[in-house]
Amino acid sequence: HVLYNNPADRNQYVEKERLTEIINACNSIYQNKIYKNANNNISQDMNLEFIMATEAPDGTSLEEPGIEYIEWDTPSMDCTLFMDGKNESQAKEYAKMIWNPKLYINIFIYPFTNKSILGISHLPYALSTYPLAGLNNGNYYLKNEVAYPHCVSINSTYIYENSNNIQYTPYDVYVTLAHELGHYLGLHHAFSEDGDNTDLCKDTDYCDDTPTYNITDYT
């Protein structure tokens, strides 16, 4: 879902070719096609592929697979306020834009007012019959209409930023999307998230096979 205020601004009205490039690059990361020849590669092929939707929720074919352009009333938006659902009436209006989360991963692309945030995502709900530590467990999607935009948001300010074989950029949108989709699928950060800003090496990602680390020392 591309939110735009000015169709002449490429950072708002992102062209379909760029969006396809980003999804393809994200798939390459998840399928270990980028780092497979690196000397210290410990990545794995996740046997997973993200597909651009070919049909809208009503069953009609999409003119541009996986892409919906939505005219917005402001050129940028606070991603936290858009995502958190605390303003219930506003959240319900935003939620009308998402497609059935049981069938689609909803990704919203728009310029963030906070330019230091590259992307943001909700963690998923796990079914009560298959609970997972670290996630909200319950049949939320089966019992409720979604009352807020449960989605991934990507800051389109950096939509054309990506690393190449010569130069690395920390604003790489390929990595940002792959990272946020990891959260959407249930992954926490591997570094310590103890909530006290003490930067202790606590294992807080609920995965014993990923060693924790002190992000302050690492960076």
What is the role of each PLM region?
Residues 116-169:
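Active-site scaffold of zinc-dependent metalloenzymes
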Residues 44, 101, 146-148, 201:
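A short, structural micro-pattern
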Residues 1-2, 49-52, 104-109, 150-156, ...:
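Structural recognition of the beta-strand scaffold that forms the well-ordered cores
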Residues 157-219:
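The catalytic-center signature of Zn2+-dependent metalloproteases
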Residues 63-68, 72-77, 85-86, 118, ...:
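Intrinsically disordered, low-complexity coil segments
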